[in-house]
């Protein structure tokens, strides 16, 4: 029997068998299982990926937190280093590698003679640190948020190899020991003979670490364009790029309602238009009442300052810089086509690509216009003045918002209290301080009650040891007479005129209010090298070149109250026009001779009153340090196109006809000479120095007017600059007038002695100055003072250490 089951079939009409297809019902289950496997695998894969992503995200989070901790630590370490460095007040001018290494490691005497240590801020110690590294250790010991993250941290902070400080970890969240940073401070050897400290910050978050480092320069800088113990006067047509500081007003009798103001600033826009003068006067009243931060500007959107502008009539923000200043009033007065700018030079504007202009300020005050147009030369802050800066408004013949006008570009620092000044002045101090002050964004425009740590007096006595080196440079060279004879014998263009054959000159020369008269030896067209000008020379040098050290000798023991006046002369003219020169004073007690041999009846031959007209100095001028300020006798005047050069990269040198000769002299200096010259090109503490002319002498082609160029750190007792002057550096004044002593022995007030930039008259306290309302007054000149933050300093000035970050040394993962 066949047990094979027949297939389902049926007979068709032809009798043939037809096979029916079998239904396979299990395929659905198979497909379902396949999709189940696929989706299950995908789910597992997604779960694995999600878990991986979570782990990656968690790791990335910890990496980010560790990096943030490291960045925080680097900022913290930099600020701590800066804070502790400020405690160290040193007389050393340049912090070279040797001195910096000793200061860092503590191999230095902290006895107040060369190094002074100020108390710590925010914590106390039982003993003073021996050096900067130990001071950092003390500061970290006082931290509240340091803790022990791992074994061995309990031994920190600790100094290793006398060069490196390792600190305890510092947690970022109180009570959370998972996220923290630890710091390392290490002295770095540098090829440029600088002192650098490398801060390494290691951030950690739950076992993940990130390490970064950066180097910081240990240096010394005086962060002011002018530091003066006497009052500062900034006149019209004077711009300052840099902070100003004075401690005038702290002594009795200095503040008063007359001229006893720590600083006086005059508007640059006076004397241009009568209606503008009236508008400036009204604006000053508003500033005195509403200016809350002392910057001489009013903000339309400020809740208090804006009140001054709501009902002020024509006062508006013309240049669109969000402030109303004197510059807006100037634009309003001279912008004839209301385009928000004033064209003053069509040739400049065409060269800058500005066409179809209407000249609106032509030949009204070209020196002022050029001064504003060429201020803040590096407009894009790239370190180079080029066509890009011209596109941003530099020297383009247009005065507008791109010039970013400011009378002072920096902070004004005063030791006095604001209320004390206002009380003595009889009104707000802004009544005598005109013009806008534009400070850095993170700094206040005005600081009152500046501490001695921030703003220190510079005195004549600080430079007692500096003269020795400068004088030694003249020991082995021919004296003044020998060098003069050599010039006369080799160059027919040179000339010497003895004083007996010369003309009488007023002292100061050119002043409308002279206090003495003198006849001088005259030297013309000569070249002097490392020359000593002996006391009693009282000479005039015209178109002479001085290379190396020019040393001015005088009698230092000049404290007798009559030293200024012995031998002084008056010019007497009778009705017939005959002129004689007679004693100005009679019956004066003579001054004792320093050697005790006899009395001195005429101190001119014991002093030095010199005039340099159109001279060139390649190197430095220095002199003996007088024990008292005797401006009638110990005085230097620089007039005409006087030039000072030392930097071979100075762009101004290439514009000179004698550029090759200048560069030859500069390149011939030894490294030691260059080092001393760069610290101060004018080392004349205690002397009276006049720069420029008492009358604003302009050339027939006004742009060819000679400019007096001063470079570097300028150290004098009192300095007056007038006319056309360009200063790039820092002015350090040393004379502080005190009632009933020195030049005030017979009366007078301290406000009679000022550091003056620009033209002022006797009514302003400048007794030598010109009456600005007189018919003979011929314009305000053009003075630019630019602070050089890279200026080296001479030894002797006690000033705190400064720390500067060096961004290009930032490194991730190194060290």
Label each region the model flagged.
Residues 2-229, 248, 266-290, 296, ...:
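Beta-strand/loop motifs with alternating small/hydrophobic and polar/acidic residues, enriched
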Residues 100, 105, 111, 122, ...:
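Intrinsically disordered, low-complexity domain-flanking/linker segments in eukaryotic proteins
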Residues 106-114, 160-166, 180, 191, ...:
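Repeat-unit-sized solenoid/scaffold elements
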Residues 60, 79, 184-587, 592-597, ...:
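Short, ordered "entry" segments at domain starts
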Residues 82-86, 417, 631:
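Short, solvent-exposed secondary-structure capping/transition elements
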Residues 632-635, 641:
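Long amphipathic alpha-helical repeat/alpha-solenoid cores
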